[in-house]
Amino acid sequence: MKVLFFTIALSLFSILHADDVAFSAFTPSEGTYYVQVIAVDKEFPEEEIPRDMSPLTIMYLDDGKMEARFTMKKDDNCEEINIMLEKTADPRKITMNRRLRYTCAAVRTSKQKHWILVCPREFQGETIRMAKLVGPNTDKNPKALEDFYRFIYRERFDKRRIITPKQTEACAPEHA
């Protein structure tokens, strides 16, 4: 009888903790973050998914908004990307504003300072979701990765469309 009780108790415990990864208020600390893994939910051209990623710097501005900065190489030119991040009425979502404005969902993992950002993107008239695991260093945290894979499985992302971008140093734009 005790074995049956413990089996049921452990099953319930694992079920209750299976959803540790939940949409939550996006409240990152200021600092440097790294995109560790990227997944897309539908067919998407490989060349459209970033293969090399520089560190992402998040800063809080005086008006309460956040700014994210990173650099990327495109056609052998370095481009600095600045994105404004604003909280929405739904604390689990943020709007990102650069050229286009779109709303992303934030998912907190079980590891501190590790987030999954899920952003929609229009491509050839279809909405594609892109999920990115973001962490405070280049070392991949096994628990955060486990949370990421559990999340993309739950959200029905295709496991064949997962990319681990190469971490690169930030480049210096010509105008800087």
Curated annotation (Swiss-Prot):
The Gene Ontology biological process annotation of the record reads: lactation
Keyword Secreted tagged:
yes
The leader peptide range reads 1-18
List cellular component terms (GO). Answer: extracellular space
Protein name, please? Late lactation protein
Q: Keywords of this protein's UniProt record, alphabetized?
A: Disulfide bond, Lactation, Milk protein, Secreted, Signal, Transport
Q: What lineage does UniProt assign to this protein's organism?
A: Eukaryota, Metazoa, Chordata, Craniata, Vertebrata
Q: What is its main location?
A: secreted
One molecular function GO term is: small molecule binding
Compartments it resides in: Secreted
As for what it does, the entry says:
Probably serves a role in the transport of a small ligand released during the hydrolysis of milk fat.
Please name one Pfam family that this protein belongs to.
Lipocalin
What InterPro entries does its record include?
Calycin, Lipocalin, Lipocln_cytosolic_FA-bd_dom, von_Ebner_gland
Please give the tissue specificity annotation from the record for this chain: Mammary gland. Secreted in milk.
Q: Could you tell me which cysteines form disulfide bridges?
A: 78-171
The family this protein is said to belong to: Belongs to the calycin superfamily. Lipocalin family.
